[in-house]
């Protein structure tokens, strides 16, 4: 790309010899071309496409040249922008077969699409093989119906031959359509199970006896037969089981005594008919596995029994292979709400006695209403966890006895949105934080265990002198911490008191179990392995496949663990005075920039923060390259921008240009489109100079010259001062003044005249360096007690007062304005800019 930059007038940049102007233009064009080549690939595509168009040159037609390839870009864009891809030709060869009728094809331009030969559907995105929620429900309903019709009992390992024949006949007479549908459904079953598993945790609900169950290929793909590892018992969810009565006509088993009884493992007998691809020999092995030795024990209530049947989601994980694993003593933990931190340690909770059947419940104690009221994870012999009350309460720590406090401190009340459950008091920041966001809840600010707590009314001595005293609830937890609670009014406080009293009265005492507490004084953290660590290690050996490793336990992810309470209670909270003293000590001992420079730790930047003499000596020029490039870019991209040099640019973009310039890389500067970022970088360059453009030793002389009433005397004095400037400062000043005059020439568009630009650049070009500014800042922040050291007093310039500082800034702006207006009158400023040494 070729960019031509022409001067706007004879007094502009490069108004001198043609060689200087030509060298600058060539250098600027090289930078612009490098930036254009690396800026975007789209421009190269358009250029290459334009070059491939047929054209004639010197009477020669390149259309017949086989070395040239021609493409209609408009047709390509039109094809790619279609919402539906084209239908493949009959003779088109697919790239691959995705099964289920889907094939992958490729268009003429190389874009892939997917086509179903059975339905004729064509789409750009790959098929997901997942059904709608309605189809999933229908699929589960059909699978449940098939299980109900094929479920049967086996009373012992030696079943009657009549029942075996009956099962074989039922299996052989099953509808072929149903079998094919089940086989097809297996391909999408994993996706369906993923959606179901997100709502419930993995289910293991077994007897306390060992139960060897072979697992399916879905859990052992690409795994070694020896790749098994012990895992802890998973959390069983009641939502994964359905309660259905057992028909006594087909689900009875005979015993030696002639008493009919339903077997607790009867649901396993339906696997043979549910999975049509299973082998008969494997089915026989499973039948011998799942029937325990005590299967012939009698039951007194053969007809009043309900059996829990696993859902289709769990049946998917069972197949008929020789790989067997043992599940033993898997407990059923009490699952508290997602914001809770631990499980209940009730004595019956970890009971693993054989006389507690897990898969059988007495229908006399079971009602549909009680089933609906149960929460997930409610164990046997426990009250289901539910929410009692919720609302806003104010809390405060009561760490001092009221009768012993002579001058009590003012209490700090914190408002929380609290949930009172049957076991805990959960604290949230507000009601919005307590709501469910997607599939998860936010972590609470605290969870208080109410076991062993006490609830009493509290009378505060601070309210004795008041006419109307408020009601305070004192809640003392089992860890001896006391909190005061108060509601918006006394009525709600009384209701909260009654609810808390009822909950605490029903809860058992903590006893000897040390349950971890979650308190608002401790940090709340999530630990995925917390629930697993609180349960006893089971003897389960389950092969871990890739899918099981990838999907974590959702209940483990929602577990909450606190930081050690001993650390937070032993260390007192630091006071404000302690923090201030530590900060003062840090700032006093912090090394200065000068000491770091002397040690070589801090090195000045090559462009920003250096001096003009050092920069020009490094670049072997009289004007820094950064000034030459950035003024050219600003003039080429937009001098008509409103508020140029007055509006601040993005600081991060300015710092990016600064870092790139320090590395002698100006591509970011050329590619920057925001004019205000470029002008901000230019102002930052002059502001960061260690020695300003106008040397500090000449500041007073410039100020006195500006105050001269005679114009002729003032002009001669300024001409003398300009001649005393160093060569680098003088040539840089000439280039800057000419650039600012070009900006002022477009004042009708950018509204920046010469006096406006002088106000901006006056303090920038006449700054006093870093020493005085830093010392003034230190004295202002430290106060009267902080005194600078003797070394700083000798080196630093005296601090200016506010009135003197304002006067200096006004004079500096007037000096810059005078130089802008008289730039064409001074012979030194009219001379061409000498860039090279």
From Swiss-Prot:
PH domain ranges (all copies): 386-505
Pfam families assigned: PH, RhoGAP, WW
A cellular component term, taken from the record's GO annotations: plasma membrane
Skewed-composition ranges (Low complexity): 33-43, 150-161
Keyword field: GTPase activation
Residue ranges with Basic and acidic residues bias: 162-181, 371-403
Rho-GAP domain ranges (all copies): 610-827
InterPro entries: PH-like_dom_sf, PH_domain, Rho-GAP, Rho_GTPase_activation_prot, RhoGAP_dom, WW_dom, WW_dom_sf
Gene3D superfamilies: 2.20.70.10, Pleckstrin-homology domain (PH domain)/Phosphotyrosine-binding domain (PTB), Rho GTPase activation protein
GO BP terms in the entry: small GTPase-mediated signal transduction
Region (Disordered): 1-66, 150-181, 194-257, 338-403, 548-574, 778-800
Molecular-function annotations in GO: GTPase activator activity
Site entry: Arginine finger: 646
UniProt feature, compositional bias: Polar residues: 1-11, 44-61, 247-257, 556-569
Compositionally biased residues, Basic residues: 778-788
Alphabetical list of SUPFAM superfamilies matching this protein: GTPase activation domain, GAP, PH domain-like, WW domain
WW domain segment(s): 96-129
Entry protein name: WW domain-containing protein tag-325
Name of the coding gene: tag-325
């Amino acid at each position: 790309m070729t960019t031509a930059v022409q001067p706007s007038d004879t007094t502009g940049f490069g108004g001198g010899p043609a060689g200087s102007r030509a060298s600058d233009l060539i250098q600027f064009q090289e930078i612009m071309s490098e930036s254009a080549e690396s800026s975007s690939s789209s421009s190269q595509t358009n250029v290459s496409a334009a070059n491939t168009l047929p054209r004639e040159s010197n009477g020669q037609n390149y259309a017949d040249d086989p070395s040239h390839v021609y493409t209609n870009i408009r047709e390509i864009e039109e094809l790619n922008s279609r919402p539906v891809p084209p239908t493949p030709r009959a003779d088109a060869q697919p790239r691959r077969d995705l099964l289920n009728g889907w094939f992958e094809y490729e268009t003429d331009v190389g874009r892939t699409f997917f086509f179903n030969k059975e339905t004729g559907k064509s789409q750009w995105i790959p098929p997901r093989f997942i059904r709608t929620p309605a189809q999933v429900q229908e699929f589960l309903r059909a699978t449940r119906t098939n299980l109900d019709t094929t479920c049967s009992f086996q009373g012992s390992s030696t079943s009657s031959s009549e029942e075996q024949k009956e099962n074989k006949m039922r299996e052989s007479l099953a509808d072929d359509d149903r079998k094919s549908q089940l086989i097809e459904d297996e391909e999408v079953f994993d996706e369906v199970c993923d959606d179901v598993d997100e709502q419930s945790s993995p289910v293991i609900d077994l007897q306390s006896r060992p139960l060897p169950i072979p697992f399916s290929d879905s859990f052992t793909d690409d795994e070694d037969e020896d790749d098994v590892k012990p895992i802890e018992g998973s959390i069983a969810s009641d939502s994964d089981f359905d309660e259905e009565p057992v028909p006594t006509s087909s689900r009875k088993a005979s015993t030696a005594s002639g008493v009919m009884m339903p077997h607790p493992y009867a649901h396993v007998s339906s696997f043979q008919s549910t999975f049509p691809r299973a082998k008969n020999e494997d089915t026989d092995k499973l039948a011998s596995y799942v029937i325990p030795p005590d299967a012939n024990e009698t039951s007194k209530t053969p007809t009043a029994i309900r059996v829990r049947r696993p859902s289709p989601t769990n049946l998917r994980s069972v197949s008929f292979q020789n790989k067997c694993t043992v599940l033993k003593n898997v407990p059923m933990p009490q699952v508290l709400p997602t914001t809770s931190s631990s499980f209940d340690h009730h004595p019956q909770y970890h009971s693993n006695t054989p006389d507690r059947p897990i898969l059988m419940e007495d229908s006399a104690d079971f009602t549909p209403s009680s089933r609906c009221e149960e929460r997930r994870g409610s164990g046997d012999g426990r009250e289901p966890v539910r929410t009692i009350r919720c609302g806003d309460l104010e809390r405060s720590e009561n760490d001092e006895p009221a009768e012993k406090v002579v001058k009590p401190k003012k209490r700090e009340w914190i408002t929380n949105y609290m949930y009172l459950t049957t076991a805990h008091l959960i604290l949230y920041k507000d009601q919005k934080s307590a709501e469910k966001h997607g599939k998860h809840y936010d972590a609470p600010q605290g969870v208080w265990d109410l076991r062993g707590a006490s609830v009493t009314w509290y009378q505060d001595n601070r309210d004795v002198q008041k006419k109307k005293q408020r009601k305070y609830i004192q809640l003392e937890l089992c860890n001896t911490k006391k909190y005061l609670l108060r509601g918006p009014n006394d009525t709600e406080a009384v209701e909260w008191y009654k609810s808390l009293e009822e909950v605490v009265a029903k809860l058992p005492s903590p006893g000897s179990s040390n349950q971890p507490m979650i308190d608002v004084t401790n940090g709340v953290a999530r630990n995925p392995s917390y629930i697993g660590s609180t349960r006893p290690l089971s003897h389960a050996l389950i092969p871990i496949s890739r899918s099981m490793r990838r999907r974590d336990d959702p209940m483990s992810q929602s577990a909450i663990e606190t930081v050690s309470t001993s650390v937070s209670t032993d260390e007192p909270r630091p006071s404000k005075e302690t923090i201030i003293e530590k900060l003062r000590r840090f700032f006093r001992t912090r090394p200065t920039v000068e000491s770091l420079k002397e040690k070589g730790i801090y090195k000045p930047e090559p462009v920003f923060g250096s001096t003009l003499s050092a920069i020009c000596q490094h670049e072997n020029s009289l004007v820094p390259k950064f000034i030459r490039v950035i003024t050219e870019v600003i003039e080429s991209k937009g001098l008509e921008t409103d508020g140029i040099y007055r509006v601040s640019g993005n600081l991060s973009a300015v710092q990016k240009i600064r870092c790139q310039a320090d590395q002698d890389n100006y591509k970011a500067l050329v590619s920057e489109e925001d004019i205000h970022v470029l002008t901000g970088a230019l102002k930052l360059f002059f502001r960061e100079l260690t020695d300003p453009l106008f040397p500090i030793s000449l500041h007073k002389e410039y100020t006195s010259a500006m105050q001269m009433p005679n114009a002729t005397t003032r002009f001669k004095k300024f001409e003398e001062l300009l001649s005393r400037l160093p060569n680098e400062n003088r040539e840089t000043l000439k280039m800057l003044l000419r650039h600012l005059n070009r900006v002022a020439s477009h004042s009708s568009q950018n509204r920046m005249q010469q006096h406006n630009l002088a106000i901006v650049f006056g303090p920038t070009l006449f700054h006093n360096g870093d020493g005085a500014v830093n010392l003034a800042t230190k004295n202002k922040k430290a106060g009267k007690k902080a005194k600078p050291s003797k070394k700083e007093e000798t080196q630093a310039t005296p601090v200016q007062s506010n009135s003197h500082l304002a006067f200096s800034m006004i004079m500096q702006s007037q000096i810059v304005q005078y130089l802008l207006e008289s730039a064409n009158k001074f012979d030194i400023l009219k001379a061409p800019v000498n860039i090279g040494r």
